[in-house]
Amino acid sequence: QTETKKILVFVPDTGNKYLSKLYNDYWMLDNGFFERQQHGDLRDLILRPYSQKDTVVLAPGDKLITAYQRMKLYDISQLPVMDGDRIVGILDESDVLLHVYGDEERFNDQVSIAMTSKLDVLDVKSPVEALLPVFDRGQVAIVTEGDRFLGLITRIDLLNYLRRRAP
């Protein structure tokens, strides 16, 4: 090398602050750094597909403390409750809070006691507009193909999808 050049090296002490985003594949997907396969249906909005084992789930017999810990660990507000490969309910922060408030021992109760079993299920071929009434009811959309659970779509998933499509 014949000419002098300056080199700037950024050496963080850890990756747990701003660089932590680079370690999070879901953040990278949402922000367009990874390409995702497009299907032309509601699968394009599912951030954590169940078929790829990306969906964080609970079983009906799991304890509410387990649900709370998973919500905290993965920074999510709701979890599908699966009996094998069949979705039987959904549990969100409000369900847990309302169940345990006033009696913290209830964290040891089973998920099946506190979960919601009235589900807003949409077929994968439903139009994106079909999500709006689900969200208007304060629910999360459960996407299926026939009887097969594909994943969840939340309000933020729809917003991220719309942002990615913006010019």
Descriptions of predicted regions:
Residues 56-75, 81-83, 100, 120-139, ...:
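The conserved cystathionine-beta-synthase
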Residues 40-56, 107-119:
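Bateman (tandem CBS) regulatory domains
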Residues 1-52:
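Phosphate-binding loop/pocket of nucleotide- and phosphate-handling active sites
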Residues 15-16, 149, 158:
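Surface-exposed, flexible loop/turn segments at secondary-structure boundaries
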Residues 93-101:
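Structured interaction and signal-relay segments at domain junctions
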Residues 87-90, 128, 149-152:
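Glycine-rich acetyl-CoA-binding "A-motif" of GNAT/NAT acetyltransferases
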